[in-house]
Amino acid sequence: MSIDCKHKEHTLVHKTLLSPPDGRIMWTEEHRDWTEVDYKPLAQGRAFPSDFMWGVATASHQIEGGNTNNWSAFEPGSKSQQLSGEACDHWHQRTDDVGLIKDLGVSHYRFSIEWSRIVPAEGEWNQEAAQWYSDLVDELLSEGIQPMATLHHFTQPIWWEEQGGFEREENIHHWVDFSTRMFALLSDRVEWWCTINEPAVFTTMGYVLGEFPPGVRSFKRARSVAMNMMKAHAACYRALKSMEHGEKCEIGLVKNINLFDPYRRWNPLHWFQARLLDSMFNRCWIKGLKTGRFKPPSALTSTAIPGLKGSSDFIGVNYYTHLLTTPFMPTKVEIDPLIRPWEQRTDFRYPMYAEGLRRAFEMVKGLNIPIIVTENGVADDDDDMRPEHIRRHLQITAEAITDGFDIRGFYHWSLMDNFEWAEGYDQRFGLYHVDFDTKQRTLKESGKVYASIVKSHRRPQLVIMAGGLGTRLGEMTKTVPKSLVEVNGKPILTHILDWAHKQGCLHALVLTGHLGEQFEGFRHPRMAVKFHREASPLGTGGALWNARAHLEDQFILVWGDDFHPINYTELMNTHNEAEAPLTMCVTQAHTEMNLKHINGLLESYDKKQEQVDLNGYEAGTSIVEKSVVLERGKNGVWSWEETVYSELAGKAAIHLDNTPFWDMGTPERLALLERFLKESTS
């Protein structure tokens, strides 16, 4: 992991009082001078670990169009009175939208499953609608994008709402049944699951402020809903964990963290209001997950909920802003909230306050489970504020990782402009602009900024040479290509891809030849793998030249009968610093081998000496610029090593690394690799 954050040098233009009038330290409201922040590590791909989850997020009702649920019924009487209607028409433009996600370069996509489509009436199951989500998952995986599925994101069937929804505990089983059936359908391919999105927002907006369906103002009903949502989450988590694939899936709750700061920090009434709202909106929910006892907002006592304690494998954090509190805060959402004089007001009227994301992490750290930023974005119609908003929040996230917070990923809200609940279409959060008349999507400048940061941290395409005959392995490669020979229970190709994915690779190109038809059914659960077969043996160089149309501008080159578990980040750093056309990994301890190097550059290559077991000098992992293939390639049979290495003497860079290089080219070496992998697994 190579992370470079210089947050210790940041200066603060404002830092308010540490404590309220009674002298008890509560929290610091930090305000940073962002003009002093160094964003270079972000831009250069040095701010986040290689396995960091880069994502974008959406919700079904906001983008799909054509839904009939509690929200579509509520919309005519909502504050904006705008109807979701066709929304972004994602239901009919799914494949194109997956292409938009791919173009951003992200590794993950969070979406929600529309319960009302799949169970439009009690006891009815729409398999065609369920299959639509299964097809979405397959399309995402084919592009190397890992799905994260949310089972409840504000919407629910009208028939269930009419029965009282989450107000009645006896209704919970309907949602759990829906969840388990969708889990059974998708969990063989979907690793990440969110049970309920923002239960505090659902409860507050629907049952306290009346801005969401059912549009009531009742603390009593809100308490029932809050309690039953936590019971539903616990029941759902335990049910899913008991199912096939349950133990290998990561299942968690998504909590919106809304910070509350006293408007006047010397005023005890302002502090009282901040503490009260923080307790009701944040602390009671987090404490419930930690202890298993939940005290709903405005309740006097807590109640033990079976299965609640430890019912999240991760905590999803949705963070947008902080609110400044007074005893007379308005309860109408459309009234502008208070802001500090130096803060920027977003289109949603609240301030941009990136510094608060760190406090959100601190608030959930005590759960002792991984943290994922499942939503972070800004309403900004002109896209003037969003680029800086992205940089600031990613900077805060990177600093927290450096300081020891276990933060696994960041999902930008949202992929595209969409139907923003009570605000209708007046608030735009997307990286893609949507013309709601034509449904045309256009990448915004902020989308380019996010994509640039993501791609700077992304690993290049992995290219695997798997076309050789493997004759040294004898009988076993007469009927099985060498890259599909099983080692420790799975093909060596799978081991190679597993390691590459752990290093941050998303896409692989496998060059096949001998028995190439046997690769047709091969799939990897986390990487998009494509195959290119040579009609006749072309040698290592000829195979690359033959596949030149499928090579990306830069790629990592490995051999399909070797396992070389090096740190790709360190190899890439050497390559980028040297600005070389090719950088190869070489062990540090060697003298008179086929490959000689001096001062970090390849000196000569002469394939005459007998290769020493497991040295890997001729075929070590390399990073290659596609231009090398285009400038030196030719038709016919030729060797990459013997041709290119010699021609790049004095130009190719050397990356020194003593990581063992496992060559399974002979039965004896295969046995050594088998033993190594068994020991690694144990």
Question: What do these predicted ranges mean?
Answer:
Residues 555-556, 563, 569-576, 589-591, ...:
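Catalytic-core segments of class I nucleotidyltransferases/pyrophosphorylases
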Residues 72-100, 104:
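Aromatic- and Gly/Pro-rich amphipathic surface segment
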